[in-house]
């Protein structure tokens, strides 16, 4: 099982969640929302071979935490994975969008200078702005657009730029989410939960529930579930080879 976008440190009891991950053999990318949270999450995860921790600066927090971008850049040499980063154009965060763009551009430039990173990218309400930034920094790494909700034209542009995509059970509950997922390139897709924000009724999804969307995704792609599982694992294994990192 693969959960390539999970806020592990934001669960009420992350240790219990980690024990569940260990028990089930789930592969997890634990994204963070601030650089200051990265070291704590790394310590929490320890040496678990199936869990990676991404260095993040969430766009919703940029207005308050933009000064942490220097710390972010200072930590970049220690990780292959970056996220959650990006731009949020939803109404509550439009007031900081110019600052968000500036911070995102600086992060991408730092990633490019460091040889590229695997990037878990937020683009809600700002897909065009995110793609503009990625196009300006083509060597920043491998962008994986998490829970992409842009237009079909923006999806086509993202595809042409070589972007990857992570999709999950909540995304595939909506008609638009299913329509977008149906046209995403299967060899550049992974599964996610966005837990604990992604929910199953009144409860947060758990990382091992990322595959709750497999039947729906297999149907959208015209594949058998076993074939889809193999493709997702092949994608995950290929990903680290696409960036330079000697840490």
Identify what each model region corresponds to.
Residues 1-247:
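Mid-domain alpha/beta scaffold segments of enzyme catalytic cores
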């Amino acid at each position: 099982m693969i959960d390539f976008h999970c806020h592990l440190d934001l669960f009420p009891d992350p240790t219990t969640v980690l024990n569940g991950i260990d028990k089930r053999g789930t592969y997890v990318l634990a994204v963070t929302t601030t650089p200051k949270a990265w070291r704590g999450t790394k310590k929490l995860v320890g040496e678990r071979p199936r869990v990676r921790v991404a260095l993040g600066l969430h766009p919703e927090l940029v207005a308050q935490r933009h000064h942490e971008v220097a710390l972010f850049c200072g930590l970049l040499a220690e990780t292959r994975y970056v996220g959650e980063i990006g731009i949020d154009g939803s109404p509550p965060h439009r007031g900081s969008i110019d600052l968000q763009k500036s911070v995102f551009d600086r992060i991408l430039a730092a990633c490019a200078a460091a040889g590229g990173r695997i990037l878990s990218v937020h683009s809600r309400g700002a897909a065009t702005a995110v793609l503009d930034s990625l196009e300006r920094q083509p060597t920043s790494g491998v962008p994986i657009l998490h829970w992409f909700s842009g237009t079909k034209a923006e999806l086509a542009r993202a595809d042409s730029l070589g972007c990857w995509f992570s999709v999950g059970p909540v995304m595939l509950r909506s008609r638009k989410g299913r329509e977008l997922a149906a046209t995403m390139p299967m060899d550049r897709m992974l599964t996610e939960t966005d837990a604990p924000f992604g929910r199953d009724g009144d409860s947060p999804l758990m990382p091992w529930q990322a595959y709750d969307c497999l039947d729906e995704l297999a149907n959208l792609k015209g594949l058998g579930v076993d074939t889809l599982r193999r493709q997702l694992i092949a994608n995950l294994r290929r990903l680290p080879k696409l960036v330079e990192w000697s840490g």
